[in-house]
Amino acid sequence: LDKRVCVRNKNRLMHFNGEEFEFYTNVIDSLIIDMEYFPVARSKTRKTWVEYEDSWGNERTYGGKRTHEGCDIMSEENKRGVMPVIAASGGTVTNLGWLELGGWRIGITSDNGIYYYYAHLASYADNIKCGDRVKAGQFIGYMGNTGYGDEGTSGKFPVHLHFGIYIKDGIGESSINPFYLLKKLEKCR
């Protein structure tokens, strides 16, 4: 890419929507800096071990009509507690525990303020707690099928990791589609 063309196009876009363009440019830059690893560790014995598709924005009905705010990374084995989940980005554990929709979940906020959400876990890494610092690539738990009910509910859907990314956008919190970032990180497992 010719750097002059990129700068010229960036300046042209800023003219039409300067503040918003600058905000989202910073978000994209932060995501590129933050995300170092695919959130499911690579299998040593199999070429493929997970499957996923762009399901962000699809309709969900449990708990009322809503849109899907992440990407479901499915375990090909469909066995809970087998597939290790790792931190895609370093940061601080800011949420840990049960959510009716997400089951056992971990939320990690990066130093750039981006929130990474890992849901439906079977279990957590030993001794992990809110306030802990984690490094990108660090083991944080195992893929499961928890959620959609009272604390401890499991088995209502296949084993998978729901991976979500959220930003604070001045109005509140917005979900970002992680699919294309995950595609880019497939080799970094």
At which residue positions do the language-model features occur?
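Small beta-barrel nucleic-acid-binding modules, principally OB-folds
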Residues: K65-N78, G107-I114, I165-I176
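Short amphipathic beta-strand/extended segments with alternating polar/hydrophobic composition
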Residues: V50-D54, G63, Y118-L121, G172-L185
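A residue-level detector for short acidic-glycine micro-motifs
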Residues: S75, N95, H120-S123, N145, ...
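Surface-exposed, glycine-biased beta-strand/turn segments
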Residues: D2-W104, A136, G149, K187
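Feature marks short, surface-exposed loop/turn motifs that line or immediately flank catalytic pockets
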Residues: I114, A125, Y142, G147, ...
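Zn2+-dependent peptidoglycan hydrolase active-site motif and core
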Residues: I86-C130, G152-H160
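Acidic, glycine-rich catalytic/binding loops that coordinate metals and/or anionic ligands
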Residues: K79, C130, K135-Q138, Y142, ...
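Short hydrophobic beta/alpha edge segments that flank linear recognition/processing sites
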Residues: R105-I108, K135-E151
